Amino acid sequence: MTPGLDRARALLKRTRRVAVLTGAGMSAESGVPTFRDAQTGLWSQFDPMQLACEEGFRADPALVWRWYAWRRALVAEAKPNAGHRALAAARDKLSLITQNVDGLHVRAGSTHALELHGNILRSKCLSNCGKRFDTPEELPQGEPPRCLTCGDWLRPDVVWFGELLDPRILAAAESAAEDCDLMLVVGTSGLVYPAAGLPARAARRNAPVVIINPNESDLDDGADLVIRSTAALALPALFD
């Protein structure tokens, strides 16, 4: 058995409220490339930071929409892995927070996942009318569709560079971290805030923090237990 897994199982058995934070490493196991790994082929000549921002979208809506359409196609080919399914099976026992925008947790059955950075399979109005839609097909000329309410462009329903997280989702995630008896941190580098600050919120309330990651992360030093394994291997064993 993976070192540390027995101890994690013992911690899990005596807790009532579990919070789970997942990151890009979990989706990578399903074949979803990380944000920068997605810059291949035609798109390797573009800076992703210029495509994932409002300024870039306003400068060339068709280009940015095509990039996201390509990324959506990659996501559509991916399937939830054993780690996603394990969390979905235990969904009534935990609060699930994810940095991933691929919707794999929801597809696995975790219908109440808190998607901190949005969902690439949804669109929202570029203006402040607030309407959200399942992403429609692009127009023949490759331009993004228009909002059915106000007529402005639709944009991906994800958090772009320079934007704040949805305050309601962030508040719910912070509450889950502060109220939990145990926090699992799965497949995240710990570099992106405010998500990376959630484990510290749990630790300040004396909740053990357990990291599941085959690679080192910036959160390792503050964790009570680090399990060097992948989500697809460790989570089914942990929640068995």
Name the predicted role of every residue range.
Residues 1-240:
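Conserved catalytic core of sirtuin-type NAD+-dependent deacylases
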